Swiss-Prot record:
Subcellular localization(s) per the UniProt record: Cytoplasm
Function of the protein: Required for rescue of stalled ribosomes mediated by trans-translation. Binds to transfer-messenger RNA (tmRNA), required for stable association of tmRNA with ribosomes. tmRNA and SmpB together mimic tRNA shape, replacing the anticodon stem-loop with SmpB. tmRNA is encoded by the ssrA gene; the 2 termini fold to resemble tRNA(Ala) and it encodes a 'tag peptide', a short internal open reading frame. During trans-translation Ala-aminoacylated tmRNA acts like a tRNA, entering the A-site of stalled ribosomes, displacing the stalled mRNA.
Gene coding for it: smpB
NCBIfam families per record: PRK05422.1, smpB
Gene Ontology CC terms: cytosol
Pfam family, one: SmpB
UniProt lineage: Bacteria, Bacillati, Bacillota, Clostridia, Eubacteriales
SUPFAM superfamilies: Small protein B (SmpB)
Protein name: SsrA-binding protein
Keywords attached to this entry: Cytoplasm, RNA-binding
InterPro entries attached to this UniProt entry: SmpB, SsrA-bd_prot, SsrA-bd_prot_CS
Amino acid sequence: MVRKKSSNTLAENRKARHEYFIEETIEAGIALVGTEVKSIRNGRANLKESYADIRNGEIFILSMHISPYEQGNIFNVEPLREKKLLLHKSEIHRLAGLVSRDGYTLIPLTLYLKAGKVKVALGICKGKKDYDKRDSMLEKAHNREMQRALKERSRY
């Protein structure tokens, strides 16, 4: 079953929820070129394998692919270039402290529109082990079975 995207969600990193425990989410602006915004609005952004890195008091998203805009010709930029995130210094310092803990990283979860601006939801994540992934899959299957049984019981 395919989930219906909300109207303002432009791209989603669905695999992140399977591979990481998401401790906290933060909204950040993203510095883009005009043709990148048009391409993202057309749904040509990919968040798979992307992550955020803190360098010199700034946060950048790495390996986020935005396909070149078809009508952009000379104004198009490299699809995998680093994109700067727009956050307050205090937020950046707080995130740097959280990410410095062992096993934690910043992962972009969704790209969406808010008041005409492209925003990114960053997750402070800790990687799951294989047994954690199996446990969460078993728990989902168990919940699905319970819901199915309750629905079946309420029919009669």
